């Protein structure tokens, strides 16, 4: 199995990159692709850049050039579920855009015309993530809806609006729905693994800078365990 792992920022890929054996680097359109083996599994690690356009562009290049069997999106997120704390992990069941509004034409809020209202993560990958999460102690691992938009969620009014639109929302970030949409078009299974670096709307900019490394460590740990689970 050829496993693709996508992180937006240097902090989100650095830990896994250092663990890739026989690593080779390819740069396309300012996106970095690292190929090699992780605990014996064939992997390609992509540093996509931040935001939906960078994520969609780089994921398209990834799928065209490297043809992975599955895609895992990793990194940090802002927490929405009241039960979760900084450092906890969310496994996606579904992913949605929280900044798309074509409701005037009868579409669901967050739905891009011609696309599903929500993008369902692959059940096998969700199960592999849950099985792997059983080996991690001292943090909560939840599964649920993750929403994506090209804004950092620091405004309490915006947080309240998004929460109203998606009452079942667990976390928000800036790439996953774009990655999911490209995977949908290519018919490639995906899952999103995000550790919380902040709680949306609650001094989130300060918390993000302080806890990004902690979030990256937790999400990278689960992704590595998951790679081993998938490679059995």
UniProtKB/Swiss-Prot annotation:
SUPFAM superfamilies: Purine and uridine phosphorylases. One of its GO terms (biological process) is L-methionine salvage from S-adenosylmethionine. CDD domains: MTAN. It is an enzyme of class 3 (hydrolase). The active site is at residues 12, 198. Keywords: Amino-acid biosynthesis, Hydrolase, Methionine biosynthesis. Its EC number is 3.2.2.9. GO terms for cellular component: cytosol. It catalyses: S-adenosyl-L-homocysteine + H2O = S-(5-deoxy-D-ribos-5-yl)-L-homocysteine + adenine; S-methyl-5'-thioadenosine + H2O = 5-(methylsulfanyl)-D-ribose + adenine; 5'-deoxyadenosine + H2O = 5-deoxy-D-ribose + adenine. Substrate binds at residues 78, 153, 174-175. Pathway: Amino-acid biosynthesis; L-methionine biosynthesis via salvage pathway; S-methyl-5-thio-alpha-D-ribose 1-phosphate from S-methyl-5'-thioadenosine (hydrolase route): step 1/2. It comes from the Bacteria. Coiled coil: none annotated. The keyword Amino-acid biosynthesis applies. GO terms for molecular function: adenosylhomocysteine nucleosidase activity; methylthioadenosine nucleosidase activity. Belongs to the PNP/UDP phosphorylase family. MtnN subfamily. NCBIfam families: MTA_SAH-Nsdase, PRK05584.1. Catalyzes the irreversible cleavage of the glycosidic bond in both 5'-methylthioadenosine (MTA) and S-adenosylhomocysteine (SAH/AdoHcy) to adenine and the corresponding thioribose, 5'-methylthioribose and S-ribosylhomocysteine, respectively. Also cleaves 5'-deoxyadenosine, a toxic by-product of radical S-adenosylmethionine (SAM) enzymes, into 5-deoxyribose and adenine. This is 5'-methylthioadenosine/S-adenosylhomocysteine nucleosidase. It comes from Anoxybacillus flavithermus (strain DSM 21510 / WK1). The gene is mtnN.
């Amino acid at each position: 199995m050829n496993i693709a792992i996508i992180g937006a920022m240097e902090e989100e890929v650095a830990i896994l990159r250092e663990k890739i054996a026989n690593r080779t680097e390819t740069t396309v359109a300012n996106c970095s692709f690292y190929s090699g083996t992780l605990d014996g599994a064939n992997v390609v690690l992509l540093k996509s850049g931040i935001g939906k356009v960078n994520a969609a562009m780089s994921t398209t290049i990834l799928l065209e050039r490297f043809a992975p069997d599955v895609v895992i999106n990793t990194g940090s997120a802002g927490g929405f579920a009241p039960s979760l704390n900084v450092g906890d992990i969310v496994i996606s069941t579904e992913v949605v855009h929280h900044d798309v509004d074509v409701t005037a034409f009868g579409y669901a809020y967050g739905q891009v015309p011609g696309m599903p209202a929500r993008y369902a993560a692959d059940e096998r990958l969700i199960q592999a993530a849950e099985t792997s999460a059983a080996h991690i102690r001292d943090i909560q691992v939840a599964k649920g809806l993750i929403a994506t938009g090209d804004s950092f969620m620091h405004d309490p009014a915006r947080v309240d609006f998004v929460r109203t639109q998606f009452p079942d929302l667990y976390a928000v970030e800036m790439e996953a729905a774009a990655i999911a949409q490209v995977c949908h078009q290519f018919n490639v299974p995906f899952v999103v693994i995000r550790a919380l670096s902040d709680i949306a709307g609650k001094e989130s900019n300060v918390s993000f800078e302080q806890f990004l490394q902690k979030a990256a460590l937790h999400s990278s740990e689960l992704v590595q365990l998951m790679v081993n689970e998938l490679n059995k």
